[in-house]
Amino acid sequence: MSTRSQSESPVDAPQQGATNGQSASDIHHSGDELLLSADSDIAPTLSVVMPTLNEEGGIAQCIEWVKAALEDMQIYGEVVVADSSTDRTPEIAAENGAIVIEPDGKGYGYAYLYAFERVRGDYIAMGDADCTYDFEELPKLLNMVRSGDADMAMGSRLEGEILPGSMPPLHEHVGNPLLTKFLNVFYGAGVSDAHSGMRVFSRDAWETMDCSSTGMEFASEMIMEAGAKDLEIKEKPITYHPREGEANLESFPDGWRHVRFMLVNAPGYLFSAPGFGLSVIGVLALVLAWSGVEVGGAQFGIHTGIGGGLLTLAGFQLMLFGAFSTVSSDPVRGASDPFTTWFTERISLERGATIGSVVLLCGLAYGGLLAFTWVTSGFSALPIAVADVVATVAVVIGLQMVFGSFLLGSLGE
């Protein structure tokens, strides 16, 4: 057969067996015929990628499921196994028609990154090779992407059926729902099962996501990137099956890696939002203490002022951290709160240093006035006033802003 410039289904392609008036669309191809080898001249429509680490008990069944899906859809496809096994997984995969590659690095994410660079299909599917995902359910996911209804289609285990013994109760009722909530709030993913491993997406969507994580957090990064870049994600319920072989997942270490990755890539939620909240509470406490008003019989004096000053300083420092993180680390979703946006986009080194210097000088001027009063009073003890706390806060914030502007300037160069 001649090489084709783009992927095509058998019903669209000229067939050698279409004789005696038989049209190409009348020919039904088996899954074995539709699963392409590495040296095939036909461009596959779908590339199915499976990372494997000692999955000899399940790899053959997974490939058979893919063949059944290809036969159901009557499209050409390939199975690419990114293997790091020490058992017979690669031999079994090759015997069943898969293209076996060996990543030159370690990690769940790296296996996918390595494989995605080498697939040939216009559409890419991913899933584990331990029989937990039935690849015969691929058609309903691929159809959503091919029709343009979604950039990425995911199989939802939590909206579908989880067979007994398939998922630990802690994962089903705590871990996965909690991590999904994080991703939905921080990145606007809008999904029910953010860590489902069965996904289908277009090549264009993959290039848009621009993922780079090499560990287990790769699964989170895909959703984070898709949500942050406004890709359309849709789900279909799927059935989750008991796995074949030993599990490679470490619940708490892997779960923490997901949480850590989500937080450090959302400085607005990690730093700016709590910083803004603390600052508002702190300033409110300072105002109440300075004004001397009573609320419900409660008096707000110097102790309230000291607490308000500490909260204001802590909040301002956290908001600076949000600005520094946004500029220095290029997070998936940078902080978009008013302070960070203003500080990173409107404040140059010179302007920030100038504003900080003015605030600093105001605080120092009041401090100088206190010192003068102390000297002229014969070095007698002076009562602590809320205004003293405000002046101290002004000095510290001024210093933070001056040197923070220089740091931000150096990070931005």
UniProtKB/Swiss-Prot annotation:
Phenotype seen when the gene is deleted: Abolishes formation of the tetrasaccharide present at 'Asn-532' of S-layer glycoprotein Csg. No effect on 'Asn-47' and 'Asn-117' glycosylation of S-layer glycoprotein Csg.
Coiled coil: none
Compartments, as annotated in UniProt: Membrane
Endpoints of the signal sequence: none
Membrane topology reported for the UniProt record: Multi-pass membrane protein
Polar residues compositional bias, start-end: 16-25
GO molecular function terms noted in the UniProt entry: glycosyltransferase activity
Entry keywords, A to Z: Glycosyltransferase, Membrane, Transferase, Transmembrane, Transmembrane helix
Top-level EC class as recorded in UniProt: transferase
InterPro entries: Glyco_trans_2-like, Glycosyltransferase_2, Nucleotide-diphossugar_trans
Segments crossing the lipid bilayer: 270-290, 304-324, 355-375, 389-409
Pfam families: Glycos_transf_2
One GO location term (cellular component): membrane
Metabolic or biological pathway, per its Swiss-Prot or TrEMBL entry: Protein modification; protein glycosylation; Cell surface structure biogenesis; S-layer biogenesis
Annotated GO biological process: protein glycosylation; S-layer organization
Residue ranges, annotated region (Disordered): 1-27
Catalytic activity, EC: 2.4.1.-
UniProt similarity note: Belongs to the glycosyltransferase 2 family.
General function of this protein: Hexosyltransferase involved in N-glycan biosynthetic pathway that takes place under low-salt conditions (1.75 M instead of 3.4 M). Participates in the formation of the tetrasaccharide present at 'Asn-532' of S-layer glycoprotein Csg, consisting of a sulfated hexose, 2 hexoses and rhamnose. Together with Agl5, mediates the addition of sugars 1 and 2 to dolichol phosphate in the tetrasaccharide.
Protein name stated in the entry: Low-salt glycan biosynthesis hexosyltransferase Agl6
